């Protein structure tokens, strides 16, 4: 975006949500994050969620909660990861008509991962199975592939 471009408040929120979302993923994908990288990643995820809550509707809010859950899980903060994962599922459940078929499997995956980070293998496996079953219902092949890739990645603390 050019520096001199004028945006409405809504457009600015959308712009920053997208920007911070991308910056969060850049750091999530970075193999050798420093403690400062981890803090910036967390800050970016919170900023992205804040902007999505203003400009993105239920779908983006749900996905922002999912992303924040993933960041907390990567940082080993299971209780916070679980809180945001459960919010992701609650938003999905309250807005099913607005969601895509990949949103439910991702919400289950976030809960499973949060339980894994928290050391609760039983609940992690339960939600992992739910995520896998829900993932089978994803109709768009690219979305299904993305979900399965995310499901396979990351640290599952021995659950998988």
Which residues does each PLM region occupy?
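TPR repeat positional signature
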Residues: 13, 20, 27, 44, ...
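Residues that mark the junctions of alpha-helical repeat units in TPR/alpha-solenoid scaffolds
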Residues: 9, 16, 40-41, 61, ...
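"A position-specific structural signal for the A-helix of alpha-solenoid helical repeats
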Residues: 22, 67, 103, 110, ...
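Amphipathic alpha-helical segments of tetratricopeptide repeats
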Residues: 6, 25-26, 46-53, 86-96, ...
